[in-house]
Each structure stands twice: as C-alpha cells, then as structure tokens.
C-alpha cells in the first residue's frame, strides 16, 4: 500500500594509507582547469585503485587521523548497528513531538493551518530519513549485524507510519485546510499539490473505516510488508537444487564436455541411483546444458527445475496476493490493481490491459513482425523444422527450454558475426562514468565530480562518492554513492535522502540537521543522496597493487552492463534535477508508471553509436571504440530483442492477472485457497510464445511485490521514451537545446506536476495533457501524434 510518509521506489574495513607524494598529487588535481582533465579524473577514480586511494586518503588524511569518525552517508548517528536502532528511536520521539505540535497549532491559529502541510512533509522526512536508509542497509550492507538492526528498525518505523496513515485527526485537519480558500490562497501550488496527495493517501489507507476495521487494516498492511521482505529474500531459492535425469538420457548426450562435467558432480549429489544421474542447479553447468545439450528431454527437465521456486516461496506469494485483495476490498475497490492504478497515468487496469494486448497483437500479427522473424530464425535451427510451417506451428514448436539452445546454434552458424574483438576492453567502469559526465555536461551543463569519503561514510572500501554539480548555477545538486562491486545485490537504485527546503522559519535548526544530512552551499536545503549498487566483477587493479604490478586491468563491462549503468543513472539524475521545496514529491517520487521514463530514456543514449562511439576508449591504449566493432556487437546482442519485449509484456500481463478481480471474487465466495500457479499456467497457455505451463517461475518474479500491478510501467515508459527520443534527441543526442527542453518539461518537476502535462510540453502535443484514452492510444502508437 502507498503511504503518506514513504514513497519507496528504491565488508571490507576502510584501510587508510599515507601516499608518498600526497601534496604533489593534490596540487595536480587542484590545477584542473578544463573539462577534459576532469573527465579523465573521473575515469581514473573508478579504474585505477591506487589513484583512487591516493585521491581519497591524501586529501583527507589530516581530517581522518585527527577528526571524529562519521557515519553512513555522513549521518553521524549511523556509526554502528546499535546507532541505527538508537537513531530510529530518536526520530520516533521527534516525530511524535512534531505531531502534537502541528495538531495543537493548527487547531489554535491560522498560522498553524498555513504551516500544516509543510509540517506534514517534515514529519514524512523524519521517518523517511530512517526507513529509507534502513531499507538500503537490509538489502545492500555486507555486515549481518547491520542488516538485522535495519530489519528491526524498518519494522518499527513502518508500523508507526501505518498508524499515522490512519490518524483521523491528522486527516480531518488537512481536509479542512484544503477546503478553506482563505488558507489555500496563502499556500504555494506545490504545497497544495502535496496536501492533495497526502489527503489521497489518507483516504486510500482506510481513514473512513470504523476504528476496529482500521486496526485490522494497519495489521494487514504490516503483514504484507513482512511477507514482501520474505518473498524478496527467497527469490533465488529453488524447489530442489539437483535435477534428476535417467542414465539413458545421460548416455544420449552427444557433448563430451557436458557429460564429463555432469559426471564430475555425481559424488557430491545428496542422492544416488543406479538408473539416474543428478545435475546440480547451482553454478554454470545448468546454463551450459540449456545452451549446448541437443537432448531436448534433458534441457526440458533442467529448465523446469531451474525455474521452480520453493514451495514456501509460492505460499508466501499466494498469501500476500490474498491480503492485497482483502485490503482493496476493505477500501471498496474492485481489485488491488484498481486501487494501485487509480491515480497513475494509466488510471485503471482496463487501460493497462488494452495497452498490453495491443502491443502483443502488433508483435504477433503485425506486418513485418520482428517477433515472428526472430522465431522463424530459431525454428530454422530446430529439429522440428518443416518447410512451409505456419506461424502457429512455429510458435507451438519452440518451447522455453529451446530458446537458449537454438539461439546458441544460430549465433554459432552466423560466423560472420564472430566477435573476435573484445568490446569490453573499450568499456571500463571509469570510461563509462567519465562518458556519462561528458554527456550530462553537454545536455544539462552538469558534471559528476569525485569527492573523498570520510572514515565510516561508506559501507565498503570500494564505494565511490560523487558530487553532482550544476555548472550554470555553480551549485551542488546532490551526492551519489556508487558501489559497482557488491557481491550479492542486483543492480539497484536507492533513495537515501530526498531534497527538501529546511523549515527554518518554523524552528528547524541547521546545527541539528547538519550532523544528519548534507546541506547545500546556503545551508537552506538538504541535498538528495542516492546509492547505486551493482554486482560487476572486480578488475585486477586491487590484486595488482598488492602484487607489486605496475599495470592493472580495471572492471570491464558488457554492453548490457553499460545499459544498466545508464539506466540507473537516469533515476539518479531525476533525483538530482527534480529538487522541490517539499520532499514528498521530489525526484523519483512521482507516479510509478512515469518514474521509469528517465531511466529507460537513458538506454536510448547507451544504444546510440554517436554516444558510445564518442566516449568508449580502450582502457590501456585510449583508442576510441571503432564503429564497425560496436555495430557488430550491437547486432549480435539484439538477435532476440523483440522476443524479450514480448516476454516482458507477458510478465506485465501476469502482474495484472494476479492483482486483478478474480482473486477478490474468490474471497467473496469464501475461497481462501489462492492458486497463483494455476493462474500463471493458464495465462501462459493463452499467450503461447515460449509458453511455460510446467514451472513455478512466477515465484521468482520480484516485481510482483515491489511493483504490484504497475510492472507494465517499463513497457509504457519505453513507449513514451521512444517518442521523446524521436522528438528531442534523435537528430543530436548531445544537444544542449534538447537536454534543456527535457529537463524543463520532465525532470525538474519531480512529482509536483501531472505527468501528462509534462509530456504535452516535451512533445509539443497538448492532446496529451488530457491524459484520456486518446492520450493512451497516442503513446501506444494506435493513433498518429497530432
């Protein structure tokens, strides 16, 4: 459920060494006077570990060895796990005191009413200050003591937040203020919009319920949060970790390397049988089998086993789907999807399903269908190939366990696309981050500037801190903490602190806030803090430094990993540029089916050869990436691009079905046995392409919890991004004019403006501002843009 107080989107000890040439090194950095040298500095900070250590330790050594240790993200309270728990208790007390103050003042004076929405926003910030960092820690921190403290903290604060969501007194005062024109005439448009948004969330949290019912609502909401945490933690768990095949199937495998690898694991298998062979589902072997094993029955068994979630995971999923349906019914909605989409761009599940169905129909039945062309190419590699096969025959013939095998055969056959050149050598992490700084400098006049981190400020020694700096206003926009080498966390974007203007006139003190957040140059705003975490393989620079090697290889990326960084940096820049006075609607705190637009659009930049061809350089020779190598690799990886889009549309459809009316109807018929597996298999049978009617993969789909009923946003925002790209950046992806238009129309507003109005301005099409069915059809490509 959404909340008036929270819009979540989302090792190594620090070793300080004294560099031998500290002063000269710092002087060399201080002498930077042109963008080229600053971009090179960015590259080396990420690619050269010794350079980074010299930069970090040399600049700060005096402060480090003489000054106090700071806490995570420069919050001085977060120096230990117990510090996090203590901080949560302090914030809880502060929040309770603020609630008493704002109610008392609003009931006794007009000034109290005028300040009420700003106070509510401040209350939200106090709680988010704890909940957001706790959410980050429990997912990304390498130390179990920290993660346990974060889980404890998150549950405590989330429970209090849910109590506030159903506080009748807070809601009544807010409603009276918004209905009083003598008060609203003295409020800014942003304050009114935030007030309306908070009022909506009160009402969507069951504020009109009877007290007992409201208590049940809060308890259910809390239980859903706990179940969601369990669900996310169990995403990688399998029903079984060994796959059984017959001895006969094993003997029929014609790949000697695979047979040898399978045989090697038999002594480690927890089971043994004279007539069976067991394949481990951990490691790379099962994926090698899916790619290279010609025995379809073996691939089938391995694929199903690899996609089977644990039984406990499916039970957890069924339970939170049931509870979500129960809550939506309590609130008077037809389904959880109706509840979720009411105030989104799409407005209702019917519009979402129409969008997805039209997309799928165009992909399957449209002229020159890229999807069918891809399937035909795979079918030509299949043992089931027959001349003159119909489209239906082809779709039916290719099973999900055939996909990787046939793709591997197709790519092996097309040896003209043989990738002799290692494109990754042109795509080091530092090269890409430097390139992003160049791109942002060109289109936004914004740079990424590395900044030293103090002892205790980061959770691991490899974390880089970046200051996002606006050259036009000569001001700091915010800070990024980048951990590209996390061992466990999939690529993720975390909001740690939102931008907000301090309420100095209401008694909020700079000296109190300074130890908790990072302030701007005027000390009037708290700056946004974002963490990006990826699980890239670490280069050998760290090893090389200790082995006495003069040269080292940085982390080298694939094109897909480059897309990932661009995608996540799209979210980050939205947070940096979307700085509002109130934090509730700052940055990425906008409509969920709009929030992916900046990140998806950034993928258009990463895929454009005019961008990578200008920023990608060989890590050792500094040679620019040749266009022919880039073109060859781009073509190679896009072989099943349309198939991937169709698969994503199936996932979005599943998300709608599992949060749709059918589960509510089951509850109305007093049926408690929610069966998500049957619903999944039924939908797969209907949608046909790569149809899975055997596994329980849906239990491994994390977005069913985190993006419940709004997973379609990725495809919807991709459709929007394509239009923005064609309208603004297609002629020149480095255009300052296009960047300014996009920044002014889309990014700077955060969530303080109707997304449809933002699109209407960005695309110069006022028909879109209505946000009606016609606007949806324009975005979906069903009608021509006006």
UniProtKB/Swiss-Prot annotation:
Q: Which InterPro entries match?
A: M3A_MIP (IPR033851), MetalloPept_cat_dom_sf (IPR024079), Neurolysin/TOP_dom2 (IPR024077), Pept_M3A_M3B (IPR045090), Pept_M3A_M3B_dom (IPR001567)
Indicate the secretion signal residues: none
Q: What UniProt keywords apply to this chain's record, in alphabetical order?
A: Hydrolase, Metal-binding, Metalloprotease, Mitochondrion, Protease, Transit peptide, Zinc
EC numbers, comma separated: 3.4.24.59
For activity, the cofactor(s) needed are: Zn(2+)
Q: Which GO terms describe its biological process?
A: intracellular iron ion homeostasis; peptide metabolic process; protein processing involved in protein targeting to mitochondrion; protein stabilization
Question: How is the cofactor bound, as the UniProt entry phrases it?
Answer: Binds 1 zinc ion.
Which Gene3D superfamilies does the entry mention? Collagenase (Catalytic Domain), Neurolysin, domain 3
Q: Where are the catalytic residues?
A: 568
What domain of life?
Answer: Eukaryota
Where is it localised? Mitochondrion matrix
Q: What class of enzyme is it?
A: hydrolase
UniProt-listed Pfam families: Peptidase_M3
Q: Name one GO cellular component term.
A: mitochondrial matrix
Entry binding sites for Zn(2+): 567, 571, 574
- Catalysed reaction equations from the record: Release of an N-terminal octapeptide as second stage of processing of some proteins imported into the mitochondrion
Q: Where is the transit peptide?
A: 1-29
Coiled coil ranges:
none
What is a GO molecular function of this protein?
metalloendopeptidase activity
The UniProt entry, under PANTHER family, shows:
MITOCHONDRIAL INTERMEDIATE PEPTIDASE (PTHR11804:SF79), PROTEASE M3 THIMET OLIGOPEPTIDASE-RELATED (PTHR11804)
Q: Which family does it belong to?
A: Belongs to the peptidase M3 family.
Role summary: Cleaves proteins, imported into the mitochondrion, to their mature size. While most mitochondrial precursor proteins are processed to the mature form in one step by mitochondrial processing peptidase (MPP), the sequential cleavage by MIP of an octapeptide after initial processing by MPP is a required step for a subgroup of nuclear-encoded precursor proteins destined for the matrix or the inner membrane.
Q: What is this protein called?
A: Mitochondrial intermediate peptidase
């Amino acid at each position: 459920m959404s909340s008036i107080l929270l819009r979540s989107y989302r090792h190594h000890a620090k070793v300080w060494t004294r560099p031998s040439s500290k002063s000269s090194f710092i002087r060399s950095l201080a002498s930077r006077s042109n963008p080229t040298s600053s971009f090179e500095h960015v590259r080396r900070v990420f690619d050269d570990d010794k350079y980074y250590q010299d930069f970090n330790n040399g600049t700060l050594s005096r402060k480090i060895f003489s000054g106090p240790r700071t806490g995570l993200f420069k919050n001085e309270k977060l120096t230990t796990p117990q510090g996090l728990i203590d901080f949560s208790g302090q914030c809880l007390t502060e929040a309770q005191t603020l609630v008493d103050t704002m109610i008392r003042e609003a009931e006794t004076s007009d000034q109290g009413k005028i300040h009420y929405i700003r106070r509510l926003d401040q209350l939200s910030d106090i709680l988010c200050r704890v909940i957001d960092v706790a959410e980050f820690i429990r997912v990304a921190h390498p130390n179990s003591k920290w993660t346990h403290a974060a889980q404890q903290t998150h549950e405590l604060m989330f429970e209090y937040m849910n109590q506030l969501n159903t506080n009748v007194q807070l809601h009544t005062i807010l409603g009276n203020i918004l209905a009083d024109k003598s008060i609203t005439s003295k409020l800014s448009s942003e304050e009114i919009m935030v007030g309306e948004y908070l009022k909506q969330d009160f009402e969507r949290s069951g504020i009109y319920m009877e007290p007992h019912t409201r208590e049940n609502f809060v308890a259910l909401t809390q239980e859903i949060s706990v179940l969601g945490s369990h669900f996310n933690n169990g995403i990688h768990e399998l029903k079984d970790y060994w796959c059984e095949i017959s001895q006969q199937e094993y003997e029929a495998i014609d790949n000697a390397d695979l047979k040898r690898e399978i045989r090697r694991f038999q002594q480690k298998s927890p089971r043994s049988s004279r007539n069976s062979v067991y394949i481990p589902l951990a490691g790379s072997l099962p994926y090698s089998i899916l790619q290279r094993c010609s025995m379809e029955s073996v691939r089938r068994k391995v694929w199903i086993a690899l996609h089977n979630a644990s039984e406990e995971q499916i039970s957890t999923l069924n339970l939170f789907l049931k509870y979500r349906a129960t809550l939506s019914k309590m609130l008077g909605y037809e389904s959880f999807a109706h509840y979720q989409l009411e105030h989104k761009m799409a407005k209702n599940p019917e519009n979402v399903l129409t969008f997805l169905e039209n997309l799928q129909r165009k992909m399957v039945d449209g002229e020159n269908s890229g999807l069918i062309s891809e399937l035909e190419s795979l079918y030509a590699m299949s043992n089931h190939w027959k001349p003159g096969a119909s489209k239906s025959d082809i779709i039916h013939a290719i099973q999900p366990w055939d996909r990787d095998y046939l793709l591997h055969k197709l790519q092996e056959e097309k040896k003209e696309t043989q990738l002799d050149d290692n494109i990754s050598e042109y795509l080091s992490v530092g090269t890409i981050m430097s390139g992003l700084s160049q791109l942002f400098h060109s289109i936004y006049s914004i740079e990424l500037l590395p900044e030293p981190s103090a002892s205790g400020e980061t959770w691991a020694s490899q974390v880089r801190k970046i200051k996002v700096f606006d050259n036009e206003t000569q001001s700091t926009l915010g800070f990024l903490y980048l951990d590209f080498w996390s061992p466990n966390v999939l690529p993720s974007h975390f909001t740690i602190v939102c931008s907000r203007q301090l309420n100095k006139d209401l008694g909020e003190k700079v000296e109190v806030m300074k130890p908790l957040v990072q302030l701007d140059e005027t000390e009037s705003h708290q700056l946004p803090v974002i963490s990006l975490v990826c699980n890239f393989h670490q280069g050998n620079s760290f090893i090389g430094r200790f082995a006495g090697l003069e040269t080292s290889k940085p982390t080298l990326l694939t094109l897909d990993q480059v897309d990932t960084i661009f995608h996540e940096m799209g979210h980050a820049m939205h947070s940096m540029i979307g700085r509002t006075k109130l934090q509730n609607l700052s940055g990425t705190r906008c409509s969920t089916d709009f929030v992916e637009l900046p990140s998806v659009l950034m993928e258009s930049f990463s895929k454009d050869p005019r961008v990578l061809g200008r920023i990608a350089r060989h890590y050792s020779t500094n040679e620019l990436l040749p266009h022919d190598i880039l073109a060859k690799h781009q073509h190679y990886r896009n072989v099943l691009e349309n198939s991937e889009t169709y698969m994503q549309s199936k996932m979005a459809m599943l998300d709608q079905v599992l949060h749709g009316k059918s589960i509510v109807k089951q509850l109305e018929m007093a049926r408690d046995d929610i069966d998500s597996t049957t619903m999944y298999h039924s939908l797969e049978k209907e949608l046909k392409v790569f149809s899975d009617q055997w596994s329980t993969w849906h239990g491994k789909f994390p977005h069913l919890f985190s993006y419940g009923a709004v997973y379609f946003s990725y495809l919807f925002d991709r459709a929007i991004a394509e239009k923005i790209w064609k309208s603004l950046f297609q002629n020149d992806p480095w255009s300052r004019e296009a960047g300014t238009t996009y920044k002014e129309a889309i990014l700077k507003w955060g969530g303080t403006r109707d997304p449809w109005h933002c699109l209407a301005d960005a695309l110069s099409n006022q028909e879109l501002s209505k946000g009606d069915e016609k606007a949806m059809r324009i975005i979906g490509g069903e009608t021509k843009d006006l």
